[in-house]
From Swiss-Prot:
Keywords assigned: Activator, Apoptosis, Cell cycle, Cell division, Centromere, Chromosome, Chromosome partition, Cytoplasm, Developmental protein, DNA damage, DNA repair, Isopeptide bond, Mitosis, Nucleus, Phosphoprotein, Transcription, Transcription regulation, Ubl conjugation
GO molecular function: cis-regulatory region sequence-specific DNA binding; DNA-binding transcription factor binding; lncRNA binding
Region Interaction with STAG1, residue ranges: 362-403
Compositional bias of kind Low complexity: 274-283, 431-440
Record-stated family: Belongs to the rad21 family.
Residues with PTM Phosphothreonine: T394, T627
Protein name, entry field: Double-strand-break repair protein rad21 homolog
Species of origin: Mus musculus
Tissue specificity remark: Widely expressed with highest levels in testis, brain, kidney, heart and thymus. Lowest levels in skeletal muscle.
Disordered as annotated region, ranges: 258-285, 423-496, 521-563
Signal peptide interval: none
Protein origin, superkingdom: Eukaryota
Region feature (Required for interaction with SMARCA5): 126-282
Length: 635
């Protein structure tokens, strides 16, 4: 049984849903509007009794049918209301009959009602103005700057006592000035302190006196009726410090007829002869002048009058007038639109499908012309083997030969072949035999020997320049090229000239061992072009090594070994030529950048490790001297 009993009962929660699923015609419009789909769906999702899947499917069908009926009824009501509104507001249609084309006067006229304007106005006390404007009214303390009663600087200028910021004792009583203004000295600390208990009797006595009675006595130190610092400023009877000041009578504030500075200066030492305050220290240094704190006003009303504040009008930024930009071409012509429609190059691309098999995919990746001389037929995962393969396929021609060949200055064929076959092999030294005449032979009869290095050639050329200048024939023009199979004949020197050339070295004084400064040019005898060629060649080799190995340690060691061998060969030639016993690293690294100096220093350390040279240094950070080691001529 795929349904439950409560579904079929007329009182069940899903009775209307089941009826809509199986007998839709039995449902009336009232039944549809009474049905609550939300509660019905909740009952289907979480039923009280387990239902079969087919039963829940039937109930969902009933829910859809009831929802469809509700939507259909709503659409019908909307259409009916729309038609009625449209019919009611048709243009040109008057619903009035023929006899009632004119409207009644009362229907189109508003009644005139004159109100009684003689009613008394409400009392002003009924309106609570303070309550309405209390939010917009600020307190006096918030909008008024705090102003201290001016401190009199006369007391501080004339050493009337120690009036520091921390003094709490009031000046001696009974001191007043004759025919002077009422001088009140208050500091920030005195205003904020409470009166002490020792002056309570004095405060009670002073409360009964008027302002003008305080200054009756003219003598200093006799009267006990008043003091310079009025206790009423300290007491709390007249309000807070920042409250409105009490109204003073005109007789209370007296203006001085003449300044009393002269009298006060004369009586500095005599009048105030009483003891100082216990907090003061003798001798008392005069306090700096504070003229900004003294305020003397001639009128009582202007005592607390503030200066008017300028009304600052907020400046409004002037709006920049917008510039109307109109396109010159407002519409596209038919040719442009047709060209855009016919151009479909941006949505069409070539079909590039991957090969169906992995082998074809590999052939496609490695079968291009750019990969033929770079990758072997089989994949080599070892980086060193791959580099050896590419090295064999792409022979390295020295840069100097390449440039000489391009410039039309190539030497004979066997010299070019020797450098082509062994571009990286360090060449052995060949002792120059300049003074021994050799018979001229053909190229075929000569044995194949290695060409001396460029460094040795430069040393030899520097030594025989003077000899060849007198015996060399004039050079041929630059446009004439040498033939590949011929060697230029050596200049024939008569034996008389040879004897004359051999005589001058005998007459020279004995040679002295050259200095380090003379030794360094022997290592730096390479021409500028040769140096540039070697530098470019080293940079290319470093880039190739970095690209191929990716930081392989073996390749790094190989590159350093090559630089070390070049340094050793240069040292051997230079020391053999000059006869020096040592060489300075500082002189060797002169006129070089930081990278080249570091490479030479590292080469020295490697040669020291191999016992090819010996390094000595007198003190830290001083020059390093290199001398030949036990294996200097063996390596």
């Amino acid at each position: 049984m795929f349904y439950a009993h409560f579904v079929l009962s007329k009182r069940g929660p899903l009775a209307k849903i089941w009826l809509a699923a199986h007998w839709d015609k039995k449902l009336t419009k009232a039944h549809v509007f009474e049905c609550n789909l939300e509660s019905s769906v909740e009952s289907i999702i979480s039923p009280k009794v387990k239902m079969a899947l087919r039963t829940s499917g039937h109930l969902l069908l009933g829910v859809v049918r009831i929802y469809h009926r509700k939507a259909k009824y709503l659409l019908a009501d909307c259409n009916e209301a729309f038609i009625k509104i449209k019919m009611a507001f048709r243009p040109g249609v008057v619903d009035l009959p023929e006899e009632n084309r004119e409207a009644a006067y009362n229907a189109i006229t508003l009644p005139e009602e004159f109100h009684d304007f003689d009613q008394p106005l409400p009392d002003l006390d009924d309106i609570d103005v303070a309550q309405q404007f209390s939010l917009n009214q600020s307190r006096v303390e918030e909008i008024t700057m705090r102003e201290e009663v001016g401190n009199i600087s006369i007391l501080q200028e004339n050493d009337f006592g120690d009036f520091g910021m921390d003094d709490r004792e009031i000046m001696r009583e009974g001191s007043a000035f004759e025919d002077d203004d009422m001088l009140v000295s208050t500091s920030a600390s005195n205003l904020l302190l409470e009166p002490e208990q020792s002056t309570s009797n004095l405060n009670e006595k002073m409360n009964h006196l008027e302002y003008e009675d305080q200054y009756k006595d003219d003598n200093f130190g006799e009267g006990n009726d008043g003091g310079i610092l009025d206790d009423k400023l300290i007491s709390n009877n007249d309000g807070g410090i920042f409250d409105d000041p009490p109204a003073l009578s005109e007789a209370g504030v007296m203006l001085p007829e003449q300044p009393a500075h002269d009298d006060m200066d004369e009586d500095d030492n005599g009048s105030l002869g009483g003891p100082d305050s216990p907090d003061s220290v003798d001798p008392v240094e005069p306090m700096p002048t504070m003229t900004d704190q003294t305020t003397l006003v001639p009128n009582e009303e202007e005592a607390f009058a503030l200066e008017p504040i300028d009304i600052t009008v907020k400046e409004t930024k002037a709006k920049r007038k917008r510039k109307l930009i109109v396109d010159s071409v407002k519409e596209l012509d038919s040719k442009t639109i047709r060209a855009q429609l016919s151009d479909y190059s941006d949505i069409v691309t070539t079909l590039d499908l991957a090969p169906p098999t992995k082998k074809l995919m590999m052939w496609k990746e490695t079968g291009g012309v750019e990969k033929l001389f770079f990758l072997p037929a089989q994949p080599l995962w070892n980086n060193r083997l791959l580099k050896l393969f590419t090295r064999c396929l792409t022979p390295l021609v020295p840069e100097d030969l390449r440039k000489r060949r391009k410039g039309g200055e190539a030497d004979n064929l066997d010299e070019f072949l020797k450098e082509f076959e062994n571009p990286e092999v360090p060449r052995e030294e060949q002792q120059p035999q300049q003074q021994q005449p050799q018979p001229q032979r053909d190229v075929i009869d000569e044995p194949i020997i290695e060409e001396p290095s460029r460094l040795q050639d430069s040393v030899m050329e520097a030594s025989r320049t003077t000899i060849e200048e007198s015996a060399m024939p004039p050079p041929p023009p630059q446009g004439v090229k040498r033939k590949a199979g011929q060697i230029d004949p050596e200049p024939s020197i008569p034996p008389q000239q040879v004897e004359q050339m051999e005589i001058p070295p005998v007459e020279l004084p004995p040679e002295e061992p050259p200095n380090i400064c003379q030794l360094i040019p022997e290592l730096e005898l390479l021409p500028e072009k040769e140096k540039e060629k070697e530098k470019e060649k080293e940079e290319e080799e470093e880039e190739e090594d970095e690209d191929a190995s990716g930081g392989d340690q073996d390749q790094e060691e190989r590159r350093w070994n090559k630089r070390t061998q070049q340094m050793l060969h240069g040292l051997q030639r230079a020391l053999a030529k000059t006869g020096a016993e040592s060489i300075s690293l500082l002189e060797l690294c002169r006129n070089t950048n930081r990278k080249q100096a570091a490479a030479k220093f590292y080469s020295f350390l490697v040669l020291k490790k191999q016992q090819a040279i010996e390094l000595t240094q007198e003190e830290p950070y001083s020059d390093i001297i290199a001398t030949p080691g036990p294996r200097f001529h063996i390596i």
